């Protein structure tokens, strides 16, 4: 069979068929080995999720440390990690992650405390006014309130003007 660049080269479709066939074989082999990631439209796909490799490594190391520290049984030789990875987390990055997590918890505590304080302030203000009003109701304040309510009632009525027809003289006006 002549090469791709020769004068009497084969048709494009046969080249494409060969390429697609070889890619299909590679894909099937990777799928059998479990190395193929799910399609982006698949439910199992994590393509839209936010992922931080450093955070994953940090939490994985913390989980492993906690499991090792609480283990009471003897460790055997087969308890080594299942897979060897080249991804590691530096001490500097681990310290930075710890610091950021500490700041996040402090921010959360501050927000919770301020919300709690704000709720308490609302309750105290409402309850305090009612208690003070009930305590200071003497005869003098009752008389003052009664007098001011009478003054407010008379002032609120004001001058009542009836709407008549025509001009101010009372007769109809036609220009």
Swiss-Prot record:
Presence of the UniProt keyword Transport in the record: yes
Keyword Nucleus: yes
InterPro entries: Ribosome_bgen_Alb1
Chain intervals with Basic residues compositional bias: 16-29
Keywords, in A-Z order: Cytoplasm, Nucleus, Ribosome biogenesis, Transport
Record GO biological process: ribosomal large subunit biogenesis
Predominant location category: cytoplasm
Localization annotation: Cytoplasm; Nucleus
Superkingdom of source: Eukaryota
Biased segments, Polar residues type: 1-15, 72-88
Region (Disordered): 1-43, 72-91
Pfam family, one: Alb1
Disulfide bonds: none
GO terms under cellular component: cytoplasm; nucleus
Miscellaneous comment as given in the Swiss-Prot or TrEMBL entry: Present with 4780 molecules/cell in log phase SD medium.
Record's function text: With ARX1, involved in proper assembly of pre-ribosomal particles during the biogenesis of the 60S ribosomal subunit. Accompanies the pre-60S particles to the cytoplasm.
Oligomeric form and interacting partners: Component of the nucleoplasmic and cytoplasmic pre-60S ribosomal particles. Interacts directly with ARX1.
Family: Belongs to the ALB1 family.
Protein name listed in UniProt: Ribosome biogenesis protein ALB1
Species of origin: Saccharomyces cerevisiae (strain ATCC 204508 / S288c) (Baker's yeast)
Lineage, highest ranks first: Eukaryota, Fungi, Dikarya, Ascomycota, Saccharomycotina
């Amino acid at each position: 069979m002549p090469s791709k660049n020769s004068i009497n080269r084969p048709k494009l479709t046969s080249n494409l068929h060969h390429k697609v066939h070889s890619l299909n074989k590679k894909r099937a082999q990777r799928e059998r080995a479990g190395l193929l990631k799910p399609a982006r439209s698949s439910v199992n796909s994590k393509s839209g999720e936010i992922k931080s490799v450093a955070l994953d490594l940090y939490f994985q190391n913390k989980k492993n440390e906690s499991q090792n520290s609480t283990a009471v049984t003897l460790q055997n030789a087969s308890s080594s990690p299942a897979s060897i990875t080249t991804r590691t987390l530096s001490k500097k990055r681990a310290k930075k992650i710890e610091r950021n997590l500490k700041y996040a918890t402090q921010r959360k505590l501050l927000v919770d405390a301020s919300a709690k304080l704000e709720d308490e302030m609302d309750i105290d203000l409402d309850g305090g006014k009612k208690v003070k009003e009930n305590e200071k109701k003497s005869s003098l304040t009752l008389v003052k309130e009664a007098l001011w309510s009478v003054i407010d009632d008379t002032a609120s009525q004001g001058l009542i003007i009836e709407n008549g027809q025509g001009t101010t003289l009372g007769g109809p006006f036609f220009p």
